[in-house]
Design a protein with these regions (language model features):
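Glycan-recognition patch characteristic of GH18 chitinases/ENGases
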Residues: 39-173
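Extracellular low-complexity, Gly/Ser/Thr-rich intrinsically disordered linkers
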Residues: 55-56, 343-414
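Substrate-binding surface in catalytic domains of secreted glycosidases
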Residues: 93-115, 190-340
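Generic structural signal for well-ordered alpha-helices
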Residues: 125-129, 164-171, 202-213, 241, ...
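Secretory targeting and sorting signals
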Residues: 1-31
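Short, acidic/polar
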Residues: 55-72, 156-176, 230-243, 287, ...
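Conserved, mostly hydrophobic/aromatic
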Residues: 78, 142, 185, 212, ...
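Active-site groove signature of glycoside hydrolases
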Residues: 167-199, 257
C-alpha cells in the first residue's frame, strides 16, 4: 500500500512552524472541558472525516466550509491532521494554521471575528471550538503523524510513557483542551516501510498504544489509522494490531491508495477496490482482504472503520478503458500529479464503469479511479453487513460544496 502520499503542507505552513513547535501554557484558560465519557462506537455508527491543517492555504478550505456544505450535521467525529512526531514526542506542526491565523466575521464559522486579546485562541483550533458549540454531539481528535511525519515514531517507541506524556500535555494544553476529545495515531508504518522504514519490532505498536491509553484514560478517545495491506506477510502482519486493539476505541483502516501512478507504467487499477477481481495487480490489496485479516487477528468488527477516499488516482497515456491498461505516467492533478479531488473529477472525467465496488473513468488519454455516491452506498452496505463500527474518509476538502460524498456515507450508515 502506498500510504497517503499527498499529506504535504505548503511552504508557508512549514515556515509557520517556527512560530511555535511545542505547546506551552499561555494566558487565559480555555472553557472547561467536558469530562463525560467519550462517545463509543456502540452509541451509533461513526462517520468520521479528516480535516487537513494545510487546507486553509492553497485549497482555501476552512472549518466554515464544513458547516456551509452541510457536512457538520452528518459527521460524528473530525480528525485534525496533523501534529508532528519528533524528538520522542508530539509537537505542533503549523502554529499559524493551528491557533494563530485570524478569522474575520465573514470567514469565521459562527460569523464572529477573532480577537487579538492576549491569550485568545485563533486559527483552526478556535474555529473547531466554535463548530463544536454549534454541534454539541460532534467530537474532535488531534491526529499525529501521517505519511510525512511518521519518521519520529521509532524514537517515540523507545520510551512510550514519555511519548504519551508529551502528547497528553499538547492535546490538553489549557488554551485548547476543550477542543479535543482524544488522540489519533497515524503511524505509517509500525515495523514496516512508508516514507521511511521502521524497525521497532512486532510489539512496538501495542506498547505505544497501551501507554497512550494509560495516560489519556477512559474519558478520551484513543484511535489509530492503520494500513490496509492484507497481503500475506504484508504490513498488517508486520505489527501486532490484534494485541493493540484492546487499547483503542477503533482503527481507521486506510483502505485506499492500493494502486496509483506511483507505478507510472501501470497497469491501471482502482486505488480503492472493495474486493478482489480478476486481474488485480496484487493479491491482498483490497478493502475486504484487510478487514478479514484484521478480524482473524481478533480485532473486533466494531472497532474497524472502513476508509473512503474523497479523491481519485489516475494515469495518462492510457488507451484501454477497462482496468489493466498500460500508461505513460501520472495524469495531471490540481495539487499533485496522479491525484485529483472528487469534486473536480465528477465533471472533468465522469465515471465510465465500475469494478470491485468502486468506479473508474476513461477520458481522452487519462484514466482515473474514485468513489462516487453510488459506490460509497455499496461500501456502506458492506460495512453494515460486516458489523463494522462505521466509516471514515480522507478528506473533507475533496467533497463537493454541498457534501455529496458525506451525504452518501451518512445515508448508507444510517
Amino acid at each position: 500500500m502506498s500510504g497517503i502520499r499527498w499529506r504535504l503542507p505548503v511552504l508557508v505552513a512549514v515556515l509557520a512552524t517556527t512560530l511555535g513547535l511545542v505547546a506551552a501554557p499561555a494566558q487565559g484558560a480555555s472553557p472547561e472541558k467536558q469530562t463525560s465519557p467519550a462517545v463509543s462506537v456502540a452509541a451509533g455508527k461513526v462517520n468520521l472525516g479528516y480535516f487537513v491543517q494545510w487546507g486553509v492555504y492553497g485549497r482555501n478550505y476552512h472549518v466554515k466550509n464544513i458547516e456551509t456544505s452541510g457536512s457538520a450535521d452528518k459527521l460524528t467525529h473530525i480528525n485534525y491532521a496533523f501534529g508532528n512526531v519528533t524528538n520522542g514526542g508530539c509537537a505542533i506542526g503549523d502554529a499559524y494554521a493551528d491557533y494563530d491565523k485570524y478569522y474575520d466575521a465573514a470567514s469565521s464559522v459562527d460569523g464572529t471575528s477573532d480577537t487579538w486579546d492576549a491569550g485568545a485562541l485563533r486559527g483552526s483550533f478556535n474555529q473547531l471550538r466554535k463548530l463544536k458549540a454549534m454541534h454539541p454531539g460532534l467530537k474532535v481528535l488531534f491526529s499525529f503523524g501521517g505519511w510525512t511525519w511518521s519518521g519520529g515514531f521509532g524514537q517515540a517507541a523507545q520510551n512510550p510513557a514519555a511519548f504519551a506524556e508529551s502528547c497528553y500535555n499538547l492535546v490538553e494544553d489549557p488554551r485548547w483542551a476543550d477542543v479535543f476529545d482524544g488522540i489519533d495515531i497515524d503511524w505509517e508504518y509500525p515495523n514496516a516501510c512508508g516514507l521511511s522504514c521502521d524497525t521497532s519490532g512486532f510489539s512496538a505498536f501495542p506498547t505505544l498504544m497501551s501507554a497512550l491509553r494509560s495516560k489519556f484514560g477512559s474519558n478520551n478517545l484513543v484511535t489509530a489509522a492503520i494500513t490496509a495491506d492484507g497481503s500475506d506477510g504484508g504490513k498488517i502482519d508486520a505489527a501486532d494490531y490484534g494485541g493493540a486493539a484492546q487499547y483503542v476505541d477503533w482503527y481507521n483502516v486506510m483502505s485506499y491508495d492500493f494502486f496509483g501512478a506511483f507505478d507510472a507504467d501501470g497497469p491501471t487499477a482502482p486505488h480503492s477496490p472493495l474486493t478482489s477481481y480478476t486481474g488485480i495487480p496484487a493479491a491482498g490489496f483490497n478493502s475486504d482482504a484487510a478487514i478479514q485479516k484484521l478480524k482473524s487477528k481478533s480485532v473486533p468488527s466494531s472497532k474497524l472503520l472502513l476508509g473512503i477516499g474523497f479523491y481519485g488516482r489516475g494515469w495518462t497515456g492510457v488507451s484501454q478503458s477497462e482496468p489493466g491498461g498500460a500508461a505513460t505516467g501520472a495524469a495531471p492533478g490540481t495539487y499533485e500529479a496522479g491525484i485529483e479531488d472528487y469534486k473536480v473529477l465528477k465533471s472533468s472525467c465522469p465515471s465510465t464503469g465500475t469494478i470491485a465496488g468502486t468506479a473508474y473513468a476513461h477520458c481522452g488519454s487519462n484514466w482515473w479511479s474514485y468513489d462516487t455516491p453510488a459506490t460509497i452506498g455499496g461500501k456502506m452496505n458492506y460495512a453494515n453487513q460486516q458489523g463494522l463500527g462505521g466509516a471514515f474518509f480522507w478528506e473533507l476538502s475533496g467533497d463537493t460544496s454541498n457534501g455529496e460524498l458525506i451525504t452518501a456515507m451518512d445515508g448508507g450508515l444510517n
